Amino acid sequence: NQLRVFGLLAFYLLEVRGAHGPIVKTISTTSLLNKLGQIYDVPVYETGVGFKFVAPKMTETNAIIGGEESGGFAFQHHVPERDGILAGLYILDLMRLLDQKPSQLLETLFSKTGTESHYDRVDSTFPSDQKEKIIDRVHNANPSEIGGLTLISVDTTDGFKFNLEGGDWLLIRFSGTEPIIRVYCETTDADKVQKILQDGLSIAGLS
């Protein structure tokens, strides 16, 4: 998926091309990037959802890569805007240099980070007059665990991101353009994906 591609692109720049500099990612993207940041000793900056937040942060920090959950990526020494053609060329170059097909590249990435990542998202409609009630419900929720994982912290940069043990997370946020609430999660355990999402819907009162 697009989050794993983001991880591969960051790995390509840091490991293969020897770049050294910050990574910028939206709050809804993979924690694989945080692990790569720790491994290569580079800062990882997290922004709200949308390239309108990513691009300025890239310029401010001179980041080597910036990206968002929808699969848009931008790169240092290039325009601070999504460029799918360049991203595709970088993936092809990574395949060429390591002589690996995409599935093998992921194995290499997961071997480097020490873990796999499994991601999914659920979109749910709601009556527009219920938005404030949903926000209050999520804001006041105080779960000790989600999906059987201990809650570590809550980030309200854009919506409500519940950071869980092991780098797993659940994000609940509203669409900026339509009456839809989006529930995202990433976990190292594929069997926990649907449970985490269901708990997220329950927290929002939408299950």
Question: Residue ranges of each PLM-predicted region?
Answer:
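Cysteine protease catalytic core and zymogen-processing segment of caspase-like enzymes
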Residues: N1-Y12
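Phosphate-binding and adjacent anionic-ligand microenvironments
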Residues: E15-S207
